Amino acid sequence: MSKKRLYEIAKELGKESKEVVARAKELGLDVKSHSSSVEEAVAAKIAASFKPAAAPKVEAKPAAPKVSAEKKAEKSEPAKPAVAKEEAKPAAPKASAEKKAEKSEPVKPAVAKEEAKPAEPVTPKTEKVAAKPQSRNFKAEREARAKEQAERRKQNKGNNRDQQQNGNRQKNDGRNGGKQGQSNRDNRRFNDQAKKQQGQQKRRNERRQQEDKRSNQAAPRIDFKARAAALKAEQNAEYARSSEERFKQYQAAKEALAQANKRKEPEEIFEEAAKLAEQAQQVQAVVEVVPEKKEPAVDTRRKKQARPDKNRDDYDHEEDGPRKQQKNRSSQNQVRNQKNSNWNNNKKNKKGNNKNNRNQTPKPVTERKFHELPTEFEYTDGMTVAEIAKRIKREPAEIVKKLFMMGVMATQNQSLDGETIELLMVDYGIEAKQKVEVDNADIERFFVEDGYLNEDELVERPPVVTIMGHVDHGKTTLLDTLRNSRVATGEAGGITQHIGAYQIVENGKKITFLDTPGHAAFTSMRARGASVTDITILVVAADDGVMPQTIEAINHSKAANVPIIVAINKIDKPGANPERVIGELAEHGVMSTAWGGDSEFVEISAKFNQNIEELLETVLLVAEIQELKADPTVRAIGTVIEARLDKGKGAVATLLVQQGTLNVQDPIVVGNTFGRVRAMTNDLGRRVKVAGPSTPVSITGLNEAPMAGDHFAVYEDEKSARAAGEERAKRALMKQRQATQRVSLENLFDTLKAGELKSVNVIIKADVQGSVEALSASLQKIDVEGVKVTIVHSAVGAINESDVTLAEASNAFIVGFNVRPTPQARQQAEADDVEIRLHSIIYKVIEEMEEAMKGMLDPEFEEKVIGEAVIRETFKVSKVGTIGGFMVINGKVARDSKVRVIRDGVVIYDGELASLKHYKDDVKEVTNGREGGLMIDGYNDIKMDDVIEAYVMEEIKR
């Protein structure tokens, strides 16, 4: 017994599968979905349950063409009243009742309606309605035409599909027939596929028939005009009700205001009236406001399908799954065609769309402000056109144009020289001034500038005194006596820390002493260009007299142009002879004031503290004569006395303030270092915050330890101090990398020619005093072209470290006569690049000095022809050049001589020889009457009978 599936039963009955499934469940059948299968008897039972609502298929078939004929007749007739269609329908007592019946009754097949139409009589009410003329329903006509076209396309498509299936079947039959050895299994597979395709085709046809039935069912008509009229009437009624309520509220407010005015006192009436008036205004504003129109209810019903012949769920039951949604372009076009559509606004508002911008008024152009030209312009070399334009407030293009008219091609980023800038300013009528560049890293300018110190603020400052002399002559004892006397005067603490300098007070005035090894430290500072000493105390022992180091100290003081006070020490000894010391010093240029000189002499005994007060008074007297002044109001400048590295404090420097006032936290540049004064201590080891002129202090806070003799200066801020310190360190490094060329006898002429020297500085050391005097007198007599020999220092004894230091400071060389330098001096001379000349014959020293001084004059050379030769044959050698075979006819041809090539009495070439040979041997010269071969450097055009003239350049001796 065969079975049927529920969806097949639904197709036969023309019902939806879910209705059949629901009816089967009502009948008590155990079914799960439309794919469930039932027996034929059960299927007949389910079909019988639908019989009262379903029309028989046999009666529907002959009625279908009749309906189409009637529709065609309706289309062909001219616009009839719409009631004519209703005559064919079953009569109803009223039109509204008819609409309700259509809504309430379930949708029946169209065939049943078609059969019922001719059977129903026309009632008199319908005739009454037909008398009213109605407009033609164009929408219904369009739908009818669309249905007919869909039916025709469907029939054509079905025919084409049948033909295609027949062709495919024949093709498959032919293919299978060609295979003789095909098995039964393949035949069964083919048959199954064919059956499957037939079943799919059958289901498609059934779906199409079902769609046709649904489309033929008449949809209930909706009168949109009546709906709109009813909605509008409802809105008007709502507006009238709201207006009436607001009007009543307004009247009630007015009545309440009137009653309140009658009840209340005059003072209260005014306040209450204001409140009620405000309420009345609010109510009036509400009355005047137009009520918002209610938007019509949105029709949420499903829109009618664009293609009635195509079901949305057509492909849901296929094997490939549901079909993807296609983009509906018709809806996009509908949006574009709407009146208030905004789809193209972005395109219209694009920047380059000229159609939009045609009617727009152009924005007014902002006028440039006119700037007057400045009267003065301060410029620097290398300024660009853009910088000049910004300074004078003009466009760079304008300046470029002016430069072009002046014949200068320039761009706005091109640098201009000072002359061009001045010409440009003349064209504009502006006075141009060149800006004076100030080197911020140059500390020396503070020491030489006249405008740095304020003349009105100058005050007297303490003198700075350096004690010099031979070590055994009592220098150390004198320093100790001065210190002990200071402690004895009651200054508590004494000198607890050695910082290189200290101060004492005499008669209410301060004196600063530098506690340094006299001449050595003095010369080191002199070599660095530092001169901090105001007065020199030269200590000479009365029993020993003038010693070599005493003479050196005298020369150092004279080189620094510092006044000398002679302290004749050890006068308490039995063998003391001060008069002899005065005479010996007079021989070396130190004359006493009693003898008509300018040096003060004081006889003291440092051991027994004798005449120490007189020595200090003499120092103050000399300082008063010098009129030592300083300005304490400016930023501090001075010199480094000594420096060291401390484990706990870092770099510690002892400074001597020469001008201005040094404060704690001042940004400072010391030599090639920089920093900020973090802490400051005086010579007693006490912390101070301020240090005036001629005050020695020890400071911390530097990034590195400076060199003794370096200058220091206080800057405005730490930023400028850092920049100056870094720039000075950079310059020092570059200077160190460059080879420093010292003066020697060979390059003396070049140095003098460059204008670096105006005299020759010499230090003379000899074995005996007579040799020193003779050599000094002989050298000073040499006078060539105004060049003078300056004897910086002359003494008896070996060449020591002090001599090398003095030579390095004075840029001099040392002449040693019958003496030798010590190992330490030789090592220092090599390190400082100081030249030492050693001689044993005096006239050779004089000749060497004369030759060095004559070298200052421009050398004169004279040409001297040494020989002539004639070219007899030429040989051209590849990769070598032309070789000329020659014979010397006069004199000789030397390898180091220059040659001229003379042809027909005309000099063709002048140059040097590349090679000279006699046969195959290289020779230095070829003499008269001999033959040889030569090559000229850089010249190969040698020909026969050319004359080769050999010559040399000889310097004319003076």
UniProtKB/Swiss-Prot annotation:
Belongs to the TRAFAC class translation factor GTPase superfamily. Classic translation factor GTPase family. IF-2 subfamily. The keyword S-adenosyl-L-methionine does not apply. Residues 50-224, 288-374 are annotated as: Disordered. Residues 515-518 are annotated as: G3. Gene3D superfamilies: 1.10.10.2480, P-loop containing nucleotide triphosphate hydrolases (3.40.50.300), Translation factors (2.40.30.10), Translation initiation factor IF- 2, domain 3 (3.40.50.10050). The gene is infB. Residues 460-627 form the tr-type G domain. It is found in: Cytoplasm. It comes from the Bacteria. GO terms for cellular component: cytosol. One of its GO terms (molecular function) is GTPase activity. Residues 469-476 are annotated as: G1. Keywords: Cytoplasm, GTP-binding, Initiation factor, Nucleotide-binding, Protein biosynthesis. One of the essential components for the initiation of protein synthesis. Protects formylmethionyl-tRNA from spontaneous hydrolysis and promotes its binding to the 30S ribosomal subunits. Also involved in the hydrolysis of GTP during the formation of the 70S ribosomal complex. The keyword Lyase does not apply. This is Translation initiation factor IF-2. Residues 68-89, 96-118, 138-153, 185-195, 290-323, 365-374 have a biased composition (Basic and acidic residues). Residues 569-572 are annotated as: G4. GTP binds at residues 469-476, 515-519, 569-572. It holds the Pfam family IF-2. Coiled coil: none annotated. Residues 605-607 are annotated as: G5. Residues 494-498 are annotated as: G2.
